[in-house]
């Protein structure tokens, strides 16, 4: 059962459901965030403990409340399998509003990140009315860079983000 933490709009694509996180997502989310191959491109680059993963889910719920947008849990529509997180993010201290995406290894290489990020980008433009949209990506994260470039983003500026060399990719205004 997926009881949403709060009322979060749902987005659907051909293969994905983007929905609010619920309590039943925690185990798979904690598993994903404990994987060093996932975490090496995020925040300080280290895997999250279960407690940290729980706090992150709580932050996502708070982001929806305080900002009116946030990250969605991503599941494969046919199987219902949890795949990761995708959405709009701009917590205090971030340099810009961004489209963020993190998928579990079992979802890599299938085009899910691009499909979900495209839906989030459309939501940011059409529903939120955003014109300045970015993705902040570590220089070493080639897969995420490919996703942002495939959606029309261009490298804008180099920054240090959570201690790692990163680039802000800006999506074109439409």
Where are these regions (language model features)?
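Acyl-donor (CoA/ACP) binding surface of acyl/acetyltransferases
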Residues: 1-41, 58, 71-174
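Active-site rim helix/loop that mediates acceptor-substrate recognition in acyltransferases
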Residues: 46-67
């Amino acid at each position: 059962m997926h009881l949403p933490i709060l009322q979060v709009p749902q987005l659907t694509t051909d293969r994905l459901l983007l929905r609010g996180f619920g309590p039943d997502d925690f185990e798979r989310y904690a598993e994903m965030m404990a994987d060093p191959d996932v975490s090496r491109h995020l925040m300080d680059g280290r895997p999250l403990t279960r407690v940290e993963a729980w706090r992150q889910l709580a932050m996502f719920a708070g982001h929806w409340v305080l900002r009116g947008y946030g990250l969605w849990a991503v599941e494969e529509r046919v199987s219902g399998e949890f795949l990761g997180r995708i959405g709009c993010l701009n917590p205090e201290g971030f340099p810009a509003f961004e489209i963020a995406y993190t998928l579990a290894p079992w979802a890599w290489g299938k085009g899910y990140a691009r499909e979900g990020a495209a839906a989030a980008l459309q939501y940011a433009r059409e529903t939120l009315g955003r014109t300045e949209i970015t993705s902040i990506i570590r220089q070493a994260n080639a897969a995420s860079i490919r996703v942002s470039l495939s959606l029309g983003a261009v490298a804008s500026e180099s920054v240090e983000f959570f201690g790692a060399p990163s680039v802000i990719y800006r999506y074109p205004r439409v």
